[in-house]
Amino acid sequence: MLASTIPNCISYDPTFGYELAVIFRDGLRRMHEKKENIFYYITTMNENYPHPEIPKDKNCEEGILKGMYKIKEYSQYKKTKIQLLGSGAILREMIAAAEVLQKEYQIDSEIWSVTSFNELRRDGLEVERYNLLNLSLIHI
């Protein structure tokens, strides 16, 4: 959260290699091609674990860069469904917990990888500002 106090700092906490690749590619494009005055703060882990392929969802890369995307859904029972959000080191444990919830307690879930809580915050602040400046466009 400290990185949110620096306006041109883009911070990420990816879990999987494909997330890091998407972030690096976009960072190079923004800093070198577009010459944006930004820098990246990326937290990575040194734990050795299997990395899945990038999901087939067409919105996956956009979600990675915006800060959150759905990586998995358990929907066998269609009664109770919970949303699980996680990033970095805890995400893999959350996936394991979702499997336990489904197998032992019949609770379905959606698992969301949060690559950047700061980017989500920025997006929310931007929407809030737009709504304040465009009150006549808001439909209640």
Predicted regions and their residues:
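Thiamine diphosphate
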Residues: 1-4, 11, 19-23, 28-137
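Active-site-adjacent substrate-binding region
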Residues: 16
